Amino acid sequence: MTRLVVPRIALLAAIQLATAPAEAAAFGPPPGAELKLEKLDAIESFVDGEVAAGRIPGAIVLIQQHGKRVYFKCFGKRDVDAGTPMTEDAIFPIHSVTKTITSVAAMMLVDRGTIALDDPVSKYIPSFAGMKIGVERKDESGKTVLDPVALRRPITIEDLLLHTSGITYGFYGVGLVKAAYGGIYLGDFDNAGFVERIAKVPLAEQPRTLWDYGHSMDVLGRVIEVASGQSLYQFEKRNLLDPLGMTTTKFFLTDPGERARYAQPLAKDRHVERNSLNVTRWESGGGGMVSTVADFERYGAMLLNGGTLDGRTYLSPATFKAMTTDHIGPGAGVARNYYYYPGDGFGYGYGFGIRTDPGNASPPAPGSLGEIKWDGATGVYLVVDRAEDMLFVVMQDSPSGRMHVITTIKKIVYDALEK
């Protein structure tokens, strides 16, 4: 099998440039627009209202343009029960935004030639060689059963990056494959143990046929461990987090001082699957990290600068371009499961939603062509818009109220951009 490293990435970058949407000139704010600070005042009245209504405990909003903070404010409480005000050093569970960090770490290994996009996952996790699709049928008694069906081709590293591996989540949707994920989180396990559990669950569909949100990034985290000879956190800490100054971004909080800074959700939202105050051996590359607004400002700045920051290159230009290319658009032969899909007008790159067109809404949802974004179950939200030389971060621990908060703030931000 030909190794798809830099040549494959360079080809993808060329395709992106050749197929840029014609609507680019007509959609979104004009390139070079500036944020009108007085219009950003609407963020304060909106978030204060959400806090006062008891819909969220608090939040932090940061907006940067041209390398400088143009808006920063802490709202509400870090811990409502204790009456602790929100502070800049509050630590938040970032849940699925972890996936973007895992993707960046994996692409750093691709840049180095350590792994390749077309490597079969079974090269690093041998048990994946025996995986099958689970296809439902009715038996003679009328009972629904699963038939194992062979894969048309192996799952690859690129499939993990694109959520096209056939690996899904069991906590949404119906069917016997979904039900097979029951009990997958029980007991004590590390990344090696978790992927062996995944290997025993039937795939939901053939690889590269459906964008299906699931445990692909957890499997990718284990690939990083095997390929690097380090734990996932060790590799990320040494190669990405520490060099960027993201010193509070980690999987678990063991230091008493850091644990005291953990942003607590409202009582109604204390049902999420993972709690970063519970220290286990599982470093979930799909949703296990915590972070701060300062760390995410650094991370966003690196992405805004195309994979470099302060003279250090984390991703080569070709690799960054490939990460921010839509790989599941028209002609890719990939359908979309819209549960957890990044939204109308978006495609998907390696770990990020990519704005590819205005979408079907009239007027279009706010944003710019080429913007990259992702968010997590608690409402942590990162948007990087290179056309406007802008990034913004929302930090919150508000599972039930998160979407209204992030969509409203995004509209305020883009409404504030004027030429």
Short names for language-model regions:
Residues R8-A20:
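Bacterial N-terminal signal peptides
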Residues A22-A26:
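Boundary at the C-terminal end of the N-terminal hydrophobic targeting segment
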Residues P31-I94, T114-A116, G130-D139, V272-R274, ...:
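Short, conserved catalytic-motif segment at the N-terminal edge
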Residues D41-D48, V61, G67, P93-Y124, ...:
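Active-site SXXK
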Residues M1-L4:
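N-terminal secretory signal peptides that target proteins for export/translocation
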Residues P126-P366:
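Short, surface-exposed loop or secondary-structure junction motifs
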Residues I406-K419:
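Surface-exposed amphipathic alpha-helical segments
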Residues Y381-D385, D389-S398:
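Short, well-ordered beta-strand elements
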